């Protein structure tokens, strides 16, 4: 009798469970990027000199001017972007307040860097700026943003913001 029951034991208590992720929302970039960020470094890159192959193309503005504070607050509500607010003593390079969203809520499969799009209105129809995310926060809560100024579509200066939570 015991020999007849042995082949059945491996199947008792087994319940087929497939973890396909359908019960959990995927982690979006909003979860990583939203929040209060403090400036830890700021560099200016002369894109014209860089394109011409000149040696002096980068200036560390943070060390040179010793900005006591710069805080960027990217507010989210229910994992959706709402407003942003910039405070501190660094020069204003983009509007200090408005609304924001990412050009994509998830990392791109082709490795394209996400962008923070800045808007003047809550409907997000009047775009007032764009920040390229060069370094997305992960295990280390640090992020790098690039703001590039152009003239007739040609970049002439970029600012790199290194931020920490």
Region annotations inferred by a language model:
Residues 1-7:
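Sec-dependent N-terminal signal peptides
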Residues 10-13:
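C-terminal motif of bacterial Sec signal peptides marking the signal peptidase cleavage site
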Residues 15-95, 105-165:
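Lipid interaction determinants
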Residues 98-101:
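Short beta-strand-centered aromatic/proline hotspots
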